[in-house]
C-alpha cells in the first residue's frame, strides 16, 4: 500500500486502492488514509474464453448485444437471466464494456446473490469500498459497496437498478482514481480532481427486489456517484474540467494504445482528439 502525502489526506479518492474505493480509519472527521495500489493480474484465459471475450467486445462496440427492452424504463434494456464467466476480474479502460449500456435486472434469485458475492470478494481482495458490475465485465445495473472497506466491518450494500433522484447544491472537489484506470504491473495510476455534490437522494432495490430509499452524504455520496456513473457509461475523467483532463490525457492515450495492441479488432472511443 502507498499512503498519500499528508496534504492529500482529505481528498477522498474514489477507487484509489487496489480495485475500488477505500477509506481507512482516520483520527477524526472525514480524514482518510489512502493507497493507490491495485490488485492481481487476471488469470490466463483459454483460447475459447478469449474468443468469446473478443466476440462480446465486438458486439458491445457495435451495439448488437442481445438485450430485451424494458417498457417500464423507456429504452433501458433488461435481463431476466444473469450469466458470466468466473473468475471475474477488473476491466480496464478503454474496454468498450465500460461504455456499454447496462441492463436493468429483473431476476432476483441465487444468481444475483452469487454475482454480488463475487464482486464483494474482488472489492475486498483489492482493498476497495465500492464496485460496479461493468467494472468486472458484467453489463447490468448493479453496484456493491461497504464504506468501511473491510470484510466483517461496516455494512455491505447491494444496490440493484439504482436511480439518482436528486442531489444537493453544495459540491466538493476531491482527487479521484479508478480501478479501471490503473495497472500495478506497469506502475500506472491515473488520478484527477473531480467535483461532485456532497448530498444525494437515491432509490434502488436490494438483492431480494425490495425497494431501497437512501439519503447519502459526504463519503457515501461520493462512493455512490462514482459507481453510479459507471452504470451510466460515464467515466471519472468525463467529470474533470478541461485543465484537469489535459493533465491525465497522455496516460489515457497510453492505455488506449495498450488496449488496441492486445485487441486489434475492437474499436474504442479515443480521447486523442479532445
Language-model segments: which ranges?
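Positively charged
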Residues: 2-274
Amino acid at each position: 500500500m502507498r499512503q498519500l502525502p499528508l496534504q492529500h489526506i482529505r481528498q477522498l479518492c474514489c477507487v484509489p486502492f487496489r480495485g475500488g474505493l477505500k477509506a481507512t480509519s482516520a483520527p477524526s472527521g472525514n480524514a482518510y488514509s489512502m493507497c493507490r495500489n491495485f490488485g492481481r493480474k487476471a488469470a490466463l484465459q483459454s483460447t475459447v474464453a478469449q474468443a468469446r471475450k473478443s466476440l462480446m467486445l465486438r458486439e458491445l462496440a457495435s451495439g448488437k448485444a442481445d438485450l430485451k427492452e424494458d417498457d417500464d424504463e423507456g429504452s433501458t434494456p433488461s435481463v431476466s437471466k444473469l450469466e458470466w464467466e468466473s473468475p471475474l476480474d477488473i476491466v480496464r479502460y478503454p474496454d468498450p464494456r465500460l461504455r456499454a449500456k447496462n441492463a436493468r435486472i429483473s431476476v432476483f434469485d441465487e444468481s444475483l446473490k452469487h454475482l454480488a458475492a463475487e464482486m464483494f470478494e474482488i472489492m475486498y481482495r483489492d482493498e476497495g469500498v465500492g464496485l460496479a458490475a461493468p467494472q468486472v465485465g458484467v453489463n447490468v445495473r448493479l453496484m456493491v459497496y461497504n464504506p468501511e472497506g473491510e470484510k466483517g466491518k461496516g455494512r455491505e450494500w447491494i444496490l440493484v437498478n439504482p436511480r439518482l433522484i436528486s442531489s444537493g447544491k453544495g459540491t466538493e472537489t476531491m482527487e479521484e482514481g479508478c480501478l479501471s484506470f490503473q495497472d500495478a504491473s506497469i506502475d500506472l495510476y491515473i488520478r484527477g480532481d473531480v467535483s461532485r455534490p456532497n448530498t444525494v437522494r437515491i432509490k434502488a432495490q436490494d438483492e431480494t427486489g425490495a425497494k431501497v430509499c437512501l439519503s447519502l452524504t459526504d463519503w457515501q455520496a461520493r462512493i455512490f456517484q462514482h459507481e453510479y456513473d459507471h452504470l451510466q457509461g460515464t467515466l471519472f475523467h468525463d467529470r474533470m474540467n478541461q485543465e484537469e483532463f489535459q493533465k491525465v490525457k497522455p496516460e489515457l492515450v497510453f492505455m488506449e494504445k495498450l488496449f488496441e495492441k492486445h485487441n486489434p479488432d475492437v474499436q474504442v472511443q479515443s480521447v486523442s482528439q479532445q
